Amino acid sequence: MLLLAGCAGAPMPDPLGPQRRQQIREAILDAHWAPIVADYPDALRPTVHSMKPVSDHDQPAAVLACLRSTGIAASPTDNGFRYNSSLGQSQLEFEAVRYVCSASSPSESEVESYLSGSSRAALFDYQATIVRPCLLAAGAMSPAPPDGGPAYYLSAALAAWSPFMQILASKPRVGTVAYLEKRCPPLPAWLELAGPGVHEVGTH
């Protein structure tokens, strides 16, 4: 009998640490809430119970699914989302739900903008030595990472590389990317910014 296993590696050290993780989490929450409170100064900030970064490719779909799960009839646009107000939600109610949904699933690029050089190096190492070999073992295409040493960790060349970039460019069949992401998670577990039982109550 042939058993197929995923490409899970050994537990990795935590490049962030709890204090820096909380700082990044709070910065992302503040960034997502700022445009809302600017328009609605008296708005009460909702609670965001979890924060799990997703790839840039998956982020719009993750937010859209979250919006729809709350009963909001949302649809994507070129620069975000719109909603059908026929169900009775006000614009503020929609913005509050969108805040929770978008802050719960920040994009990889957004989170990476808060990482130090050593944390970016750890993310690069995970994608280059775990994700890419896993994709190749699954029979998928994956480009070699830029080879420039530590200087690349903060460069545009590194930001432009992803082990999934060839897969996405090939316009794969429906379900292919989801299967490969489940088998070869594009982001490491240590990048999750809040685990079960961690709650953030907004007050501003």
Feature roles, as predicted:
Residues 8-204:
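Mitochondrial intermembrane space
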Residues 3-6:
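C-terminal motif of bacterial Sec signal peptides marking the signal peptidase cleavage site
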